Structure formats: structure tokens, C-alpha cells
Amino acid sequence: SDIKVPVVTVDSICQNHNLTPPFLIKLDTHGFEVPIFEGATETLKNTNFIVVETYNFDIADKSLRFYQICQYLEEKGFRCVDICEPLFRKRDDALWQFDLFFIRDNHPTFSCDSWS
């Protein structure tokens, strides 16, 4: 049986609930990240930190793999700063999913490109 749920945007939630920035966005949406970000254009302008569960495989139609999420968010002014919780597929130990952490591309972390 199909279950119908209302779809609302992140921007409308923030506006309707008078939420004040700065924002942190955490997504664990199994391939639905782009439509969510598309509904968060204003919220993203006031977001400093994003955590996204990403995949190394195409898990859904139009889903983005981890490197594509990095490219997509870089276009929005964010860069990946950390990774955690890698999960490996049981049948062949292939890297399946992990969380990526993003901060603003103008954060002081990125002012130095050297190791030391």
C-alpha cells in the first residue's frame, strides 16, 4: 500500500516556524538530497555546517554519489572538511556509504593549503 505524506521545503519550514540562523543541515535521505537542497536555497545562504550521508553507488534514480555531492555543494559555497562512519558492503567489502561534513568555503580552515 502507498503512504502519502505532505512534501514541504526546508525554506518553508524555517519561515513558518520563524527559525533563526545560523543553520546546521543534516541529511540522511537515501538519494533525495538534491530536491531537498533545491527547496533550501534561502536556508543555505544562512547555513554554516552540513552533514550528508553519501553513497559510493547509485542507490536511486537521480541520486548523486559522494563525489557528486561534493561538487554540488562546492557550487553552493561549501567544501568537505571531514568524513566519518564508513560502511562497507558485506558481500565484497566495497565502500558503500559514509557521512561527509561540509563547511563554508571561506572558512579559515581553507586558508592554508599546506600539510604543515
Regions found by a protein language model. Name each.
Residues S1-V8, S12, H17:
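Glycine-rich adenosyl-binding loop in Rossmann-like folds that engage adenosine-containing cofactors
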Residues I13-S116:
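Conserved acidic-Pro-Pro-aromatic motif
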